[in-house]
Amino acid sequence: MQIDQRQVGPGVGPFIVAEMSGNHNKSLVRAMEIVEAAAKAGVHGLKIQTYTPDTMTIDLDDREFRIRDSNSPWEGTSLYRLYGEAYTPWEWHQPIFDRARELGIVAFSTPFDNTAVDFLESLNAPCYKIASFENTDVPLISRAAATGKPLIISTGMATVAELDESVRAARDAGCRDLILLKCASTYPAPPEDTNLLTLPHLRELFDCEVGLSDHTMGVGVSVAAVALGASVIEKHFTLSRADGGVDSTFSMEPAEMAQLVVETERAWQALGQVRYGPTEAEKKSLQFRRSLYVVQDLRAGDVLTRDNVRAIRPGLGLPPKYLGQVLGKAVKQDVKRGTALGWELV
């Protein structure tokens, strides 16, 4: 499939997406610096999020409207306050998209309600990403799919039945290009909860492209995902975790993102195809195999023994498997020590 000017799928390297999220820390200048740092790191896509606190929740401080997870960086924060801190003002979208396009990377967003889809359509967004927490919001999925643009859905927490319902809704609404991202909806996510072996199963089960929305630290999990068929890798991105911000603790810094781009591309290149025998590059190494060599000076008529014939490097003589056949045979001519043994000598 094609997202903007970028091909996405198994025939090309992985599509690496830097997720800005709320790491702009309410500064458009910082947001632009993140775009530029992402492009410099070599990513192919930059994603933001399109919502306001009021499109996400209501302004209540009751217990059920607070984050209650001692392992969460947002422990104790009300949902409304969190989204007020993290949201990207809608008037920033156009300059962010424009700058990303100037730098040659695909800019797109995650809409969280239908008004966000309508707004992103006015910006000619090239695709849509549905977040894990919205992957059961069938009306939203249908609205985004109805645009006819590629649709990316994170699968965090979703059962097979829930995913089946969401995928059917997307396709019924007109989605033809679908990508499902394996995702562990914890922040950060431990590698053991990532379950990457799900990737090939997702691809087979839903006949679509697959990828990873990676909340683990480091690059190892993403590299492994590419080895298992991921065509898309999404990682949260910030200028520096030390700067703080709602998602900074589990976001990649520029040097790490650059490493991710390089290592996932290497992993994809290494996949190759099912193949045996020497590659073109390996053929010159065949000479360093072991083969049969005469290791003592011999006169015509001398008998070959284990003392005067050995399997050694280089590989210009008979293969070692013929040692048993040549032992006990006489040489036809004088043979100098270090001569590759061939059938013409016995």
Residue ranges and their predicted role:
Residues 1-346:
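Catalytic cores and adjacent flexible loops of soluble metabolic enzymes
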